[in-house]
Amino acid sequence: MNLRIPGPIPVPDDILEEMSGPMINHRGPEYKDLLFRTTDRLKQIFETTGDVWVITSSGSGAMEAAIVNTLSPGDKVVNATIGVFGNRFTDIAEIYGAEVITLSFPFGEVIDLDTLRDTLNDDPDIKAVMVTHNETSTGVTND
């Protein structure tokens, strides 16, 4: 079976075989070494010298982590949304007390940068901009 969705995905046999081995201690030196090797490789892929974080959650969990670690209740933010997961950014930010200006663009299209730019220029109190890079619900990527 070959599914054309974000997940689950077909897993190659060699990966399944590797996964059948014993678990490693996620607080031990073997895991620490694995994590550092992985983040070093991710830095190369993303062409950065900055920190790279591996988050063991769904995409929604990563969105929530981004919000709770950067915003405070009452902060004004803009969310430019083009789909279901973009809308989720608004929901999560509002749950944590942010004042969200939601710019909704047609599903299946990228955000309009002129509209976003105008919104930012019109309100100096905006602390953050939220954009879903790859909107899974429509398959559109905001560049």
Each model region followed by its residue ranges:
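Active-site-proximal loop->helix
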Residues: 88-101, 106, 114-119
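Short coil/turn connectors at secondary-structure junctions
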Residues: 48-50, 73-76, 96-99, 123-127
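Conserved beta-loop-alpha segment that forms the PLP phosphate-binding cup at the N-terminus of a helix
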Residues: 49-78, 82, 86-90
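Active-site phosphate-binding strand-loop segment of PLP-dependent enzymes
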Residues: 111-143
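A glycine-/small-polar-enriched, mobile loop at the entrance of the PLP active site in fold-type I
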Residues: 1-56
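A short acidic, glycine/proline-enriched capping/turn motif at secondary-structure boundaries
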Residues: 61-62, 83-87, 99, 107-110, ...
